[in-house]
């Protein structure tokens, strides 16, 4: 009987170890494609890329070779994620590209807040000498932390669309865009919890 009890205990222990191993593999897969890059950014406080896969799943198309990554926003170096909307032949296609850094030569540029929507700031970008360089929506996903960082999405309208024609609510309420934002935000929150 003792022999059978020992075997039973060993069998149960082996099963528990197996379950733990499976669980850890599943946890590793959660957020796969995002988490490695986000963790790197959080620890090093530097620019990082996020997988383009979520954008592909939502039907986003890669316009050129330099539009294959997303960039996290950082207040210190004024970088942001860009989702750029182009209009061609009456058909719109959305691409993702790295943020532009205006640099010192563009110090005359300013962002004018044109409203708040769903807890996010909405900006319109103006160029020097009152000429409109671009129109954008910047949606802030998280509050600035003790690291002085804020995650945001910058929607940049640079061709075929005037600022006055921009319907912010319609764009922000679009199903694909909201799904993209919620997926991205959950990933950031998961990563922040792990690094605490």
Predicted features, each with a name:
Residues 1-10:
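Bacterial N-terminal signal peptides that target proteins for export
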Residues 33-41, 66-70, 114-124:
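Short, hydrophobic/aromatic-rich segments at coil-to-beta transitions
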Residues 31-53:
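Post-signal peptide N-terminal segment of mature Sec-exported envelope proteins
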Residues 100-148:
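Signature of long, low-cysteine stretches enriched in small and polar/charged residues
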Residues 18-21:
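C-terminal motif of bacterial Sec signal peptides marking the signal peptidase cleavage site
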Residues 23-25:
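Bacterial signal peptide processing site
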Residues 58, 153-196:
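Surface-exposed amphipathic alpha-helical segments
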Residues 46-101, 129-132:
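Secretory pathway targeting signatures of secreted, lumenal, and periplasmic proteins
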């Amino acid at each position: 009987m003792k022999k059978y009890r020992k075997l039973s205990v060993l069998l149960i222990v082996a099963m528990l170890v197996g379950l733990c191993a499976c669980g850890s593999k599943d946890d590793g897969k959660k957020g796969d494609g995002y988490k490695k890059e986000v963790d790197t950014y959080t620890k090093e406080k530097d620019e990082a890329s996020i997988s383009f896969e979520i954008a592909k799943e939502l039907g986003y198309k890669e316009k050129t070779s330099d539009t294959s990554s997303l960039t996290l926003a950082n207040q210190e170096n004024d970088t942001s994620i860009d989702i750029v909307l182009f209009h061609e032949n009456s058909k719109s296609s959305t691409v993702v590209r790295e943020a532009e850094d205006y640099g010192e030569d563009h110090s005359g540029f300013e962002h004018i807040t044109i409203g708040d929507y769903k807890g996010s700031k909405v900006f319109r970008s103006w160029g020097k000498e009152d000429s409109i360089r671009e129109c954008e929506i910047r949606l802030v996903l998280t509050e600035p932390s003790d690291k002085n960082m804020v995650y945001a999405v910058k929607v940049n309208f640079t061709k075929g669309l005037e600022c006055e024609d921009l319907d912010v609510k319609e764009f922000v309420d679009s199903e694909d865009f909201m799904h993209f934002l919620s997926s991205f935000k959950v990933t950031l929150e998961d990563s922040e919890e792990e690094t605490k």
